[in-house]
């Protein structure tokens, strides 16, 4: 409200500005040490727990959303809005919990950052692979297909950083696991409906509701594309329409009376179910989002930025011997690679993209600066030298 919004939107560009501000802030932050950067994957994992409680609470008890929203924004607004429109008992849709996927991804990345694949068969590391599977299960339990896709890309990027082209060997294993899950569904097991929705793109005897809702989501995205190029793109093709929108538009999703009024206004509009998402700068389609907000000019710069992100992160790990790759390198490439690919293929939201990408690339940049100064650092006092973590092949005592 201090920023002028009357609903849950209206000033999305403020979040973008905050995300972008991490570039100069983290780049110039004093006192950031080598060992601090190696703790980032652990901090990321611990931070993923923050959203769990409020999102679970507001998913299963949607009426608590307005109360939680007063102090924290990590609530399931979609479930609250669906309840206002009559989704009692969940008969209108499958409840999805994105915080579970965030936790699962962070768990998998923490394992891969601190425990390289070549050590997994050691007796004290046999728990790592089950934890990676658990991370994938949490992504599936979230109900979001794009998180399954991104988790797979994150695992591949992390393994590429430590075992290079041997990481391609995981592809047959992943395909076999997918076929096994599909073959057992409906015959030996009935997986939770959210898992079935997330995995419905694979062959299998999936629940009709899960398949239907997933297909409807795909069709919905196609309508987003059609409407954007039909009615919105030509309005500002070069520079886009900006990030600001009328904040009163978002009120229809959280106010029962306004929702009914909006439904009457939408009568006869074949794009009524997708129009508000474009107008509120939340089209769920990456290419549409960047063209809508910044136009062709901004899209050219954005694509160049994305290519630079991938080149910089992969170059960092490629020029480092596999046994010497550090946790911050693994974490950075595992964050950047899936989110860039997913933005252009399965799901794209510019705000969420920048919130994750800007800190990740800046922390990797700080690491590279420190690495360049390592000879000078190692020439310092023995106390300073002993403060550096051991190479990846010899983990510190706390993780060995």
Where are these regions (language model features)?
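Alpha-helical transmembrane segments of multi-pass inner-membrane proteins
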Residues: 16-25, 38-82, 86-162, 360, ...
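Transmembrane signal-anchor hairpin modules in multi-pass inner-membrane enzymes, especially those
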Residues: 1-8, 28-45, 67-69, 113-129, ...
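Hydrophobic, aromatic-rich transmembrane alpha-helices
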Residues: 105-120, 297-320
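A membrane-periplasm/extracellular boundary helix in multi-pass inner-membrane enzymes
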Residues: 59-66, 142, 159-214, 230-235, ...
């Amino acid at each position: 409200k201090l920023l002028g919004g009357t609903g849950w939107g209206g000033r999305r560009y403020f979040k973008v500005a905050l995300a972008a501000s991490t570039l100069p802030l983290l780049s110039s932050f004093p006192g950031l040490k080598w060992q601090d950067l190696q703790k980032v994957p652990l901090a990321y994992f611990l931070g993923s727990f923050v959203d769990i409680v409020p999102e679970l609470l507001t998913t299963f008890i949607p009426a608590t959303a307005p109360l939680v929203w007063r102090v924290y924004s990590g609530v399931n607004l979609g479930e609250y809005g669906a309840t206002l429109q009559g989704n009692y008992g969940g008969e209108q849709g499958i409840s999805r919990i994105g915080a579970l996927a965030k936790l699962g991804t962070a768990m998998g990345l923490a394992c891969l950052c601190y425990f390289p694949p070549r050590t997994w068969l050691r007796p004290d590391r046999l728990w790592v692979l089950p934890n990676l599977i658990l991370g994938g299960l949490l992504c599936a339990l979230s109900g979001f297909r794009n998180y399954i896709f991104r988790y797979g890309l994150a695992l591949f990027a992390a393994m590429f950083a430590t075992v290079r082209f041997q990481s391609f060997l995981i592809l047959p294993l992943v395909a076999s696991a997918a076929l096994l899950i599909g073959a057992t569904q409906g015959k030996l097991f009935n997986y939770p409906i959210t898992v079935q929705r997330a995995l419905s793109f694979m062959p299998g005897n999936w629940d009709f509701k899960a398949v239907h809702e997933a297909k409807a989501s795909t069709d919905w995205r196609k309508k987003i594309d059609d409407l954007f190029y039909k009615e919105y793109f030509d309005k500002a093709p070069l520079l886009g329409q900006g990030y600001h929108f009328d904040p009163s538009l978002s009120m229809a999703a959280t106010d029962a009376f306004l929702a009914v009024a909006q439904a009457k206004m939408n009568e006869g509009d074949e794009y009524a179910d997708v129009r508000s998402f474009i107008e509120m700068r939340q089209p769920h389609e990456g290419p549409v989002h960047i063209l809508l907000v910044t136009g062709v000019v901004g899209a050219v710069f954005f694509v160049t930025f994305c290519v630079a992100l991938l080149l910089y992160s992969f170059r960092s790990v490629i020029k480092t011997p596999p046994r010497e790759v550090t946790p911050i390198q693994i974490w950075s490439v595992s964050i950047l690679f899936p989110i860039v690919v997913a933005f252009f293929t399965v799901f794209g939201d510019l705000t969420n993209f920048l919130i994750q990408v800007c800190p990740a690339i800046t922390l990797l940049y700080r690491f590279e600066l420190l690495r360049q100064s390592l000879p000078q650092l190692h020439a310092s006092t023995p106390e300073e030298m002993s403060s550096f973590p051991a190479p990846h092949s010899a983990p510190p005592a706390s993780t060995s």
